[in-house]
Swiss-Prot record:
It is an enzyme of class 2 (transferase). One of its GO terms (biological process) is alcohol metabolic process. It holds the Pfam family Transferase. Involved in the biosynthesis of volatile esters which confer ripe apple fruit flavor. Alcohol acyl transferase that can use a wide range of alcohols as substrate to produce esters. Expressed at very low levels in the cortex and skin of ripe fruit. The fruit of cv. Royal Gala exhibits a high ester accumulation, whereas the cv. Granny Smith contains low ester levels; this influences strongly the ripe apple fruit aroma. Its EC number is 2.3.1.-. It comes from the Eukaryota. GO terms for molecular function: acyltransferase activity. Coiled coil: none annotated. Belongs to the plant acyltransferase family. The gene is AAT1GSD. The active site is at H164 (proton acceptor), N385 (proton acceptor). This is Alcohol acyl transferase 1 allele GSd.
């Protein structure tokens, strides 16, 4: 079925969803990891569900989710508040119970007709997550915008936009899981939320004990042609990495790295190299890639309660001059990525918190020679079940300037990874060419395998 030439989405006026019961009226402080200048933006997430009459006959997803949101906000009541700015631009949460913004909508289209249009970079995102005037700010605005759009097939799309200073992906998932549990009839979340942002406050006295290349200024040898300040020239596409692409990339890696190399590491090294080539960066220019590393779990020794829903990550940066990155085999970039990720531990995270205090919350560089990547393939968005089963797709809706989110995607019958990328139109064409070249099977392998290159570009 073809997608209609003009998509008709009817939206009711937005409403504020408040906690279902009275909640504490108080002021809460964010941690230094939350209160970073670089997190003062909103993250869009999209979740798409098929109709499931056997599970939810005659139940309205808008009504179910609206009520579950209100009940979940009793436990996550700071999300119903507003951010205020104190001395030195320090953010605090005014827990005033004003509520989150909720929009009910319907569209004359089926999920099947939408096809790949629901995947990052989701060209129809503005239809399914309308930017109501006054909803996009950081200070004094709703911390969460949710739009539920019912489709003619009986399925629906839940799209949301979250103020990143409040939660990271793991924290948002805790909140969404609580909503989903209540939508399915639970009286309380199975994991109770924990605020306790003081666990990641700066130390007294603060002390920077690690190198933090992600916050360092670099000497700019460029002509500024790849700066991200001119948004009118930027385009978004997504690229698919399946079994064939990963097999070709692994053949380019020296034996001593293969056994310890993750799929995320390898894709990141590949993107970093191809993007640097595509941007035609001055050979002397320092280029960086940062990997967002979750501090939760035993691996990094950061002791946080199970229900902690604040930001708990760092993004250590790998650094290289453009020339060796572009001229060396892929193993060069891979080794740098692995070494940067290995620096992450509790001391690194606490050093970041202290740096925020001592250096006045510096932001990462916004030049095109910097890339930030986040692995959302195991974030758990695909497990969120409001009563209609698991979503056919769930995750970040698009790339954000310098930030690319890796998401799980099934291409036909194969599980792979979809990576949205944001670049200028000319650089995007070169990037796609470089990516096709580096993932192209040698001719002798093609003859044996008879499979064509499947790097996909989704407009």
């Amino acid at each position: 079925m073809m997608l209609p030439s003009v998509l008709q989405v009817k939206r009711l006026q937005p409403e504020l969803i408040t906690p279902a019961k009275p909640t504490p009226q108080e002021t809460k402080f964010l941690s230094e990891i939350d209160d970073q200048e670089s997190l003062r933006f909103q993250v869009p997430v999209i979740m798409c569900y098929k109709a499931n009459p056997s599970l939810n006959k005659n139940r309205n997803p808008v009504k179910v989710i609206r009520e579950a949101l209100s009940r979940a906000l009793v436990y996550y009541y700071p999300l119903a508040g507003r951010l205020r700015e104190g001395p030195n631009k320090k953010l605090v949460v005014d827990c005033n119970g004003e509520g989150i913004l909720f929009v009910e909508a319907s569209a004359d289209v089926t999920l099947e007709q939408l096809g790949d249009k629901i995947l990052p970079p989701c060209p129809l995102l503005e239809e399914f997550l309308f930017n109501f005037p006054g909803s996009g700010g950081i200070i004094g605005c709703p911390l969460l915008l949710v739009q539920v759009t019912c489709l003619t097939c009986g399925g629906f799309i839940l799209a949301l936009r979250l103020n990143h200073t409040m939660c990271d992906a793991s924290g948002l998932l805790l909140f969404l899981t609580a909503i989903a549990e209540m939508a399915r009839g639970a009286h309380a979340p199975s994991i109770l939320p924990v605020w306790e942002r003081e666990l990641l406050f700066a130390r007294n006295p603060p002390r920077i004990t690690c190198a933090h290349h992600e916050y360092e200024d670099v000497i700019d040898h460029s002509d500024g042609s790849y700066a991200f300040s001119n948004q009118s020239n930027m385009v978004q596409r997504s690229f698919y990495f399946g079994a064939k692409e990963m097999r070709v990339l692994r053949k380019q890696i020296p034996p001593h790295l293969i056994s310890t190399c993750s799929t995320f590491d390898l894709i990141t090294a590949c993107l970093w190299k191809c993007r640097t080539l595509a941007l035609k960066i001055n050979p002397k220019q320092a280029v960086r890639v940062s990997c967002i590393v979750n501090a939760r779990g035993k691996h990094h020794n950061v002791r946080l309660p199970l229900g902690y829903y604040g930001n708990a990550f760092a993004y250590p940066a790998a650094v290289s001059k453009a020339e060796p990155l572009c001229k060396n085999p892929l193993g060069y970039a891979l080794e740098l990525v692995k070494k940067a990720k290995a620096t992450m531990n509790e001391e690194y995270l606490r050093s970041v918190a202290d740096l925020m205090v001592l250096r006045g919350r510096p932001q990462y560089s916004t030049t095109g020679c910097y890339l930030i990547v986040s692995d959302n393939t195991r974030a758990g968005f695909g497990d969120v079940n409001f009563g209609w089963g698991e979503p056919v797709f769930a995750g970040p809706a698009k790339a954000l300037d310098l930030i690319s989110f890796y998401v799980q995607h099934k291409n036909n019958t194969e599980d792979g990874i979809l990576v949205p990328m944001c670049l200028s139109s000319s650089a995007m064409e070169r990037f796609q060419q470089e990516l096709e070249r580096i993932t192209q099977e040698p001719k002798e392998d093609i003859c044996n395998n008879l499979r064509s290159t499947r790097i996909m570009s989704m407009m």
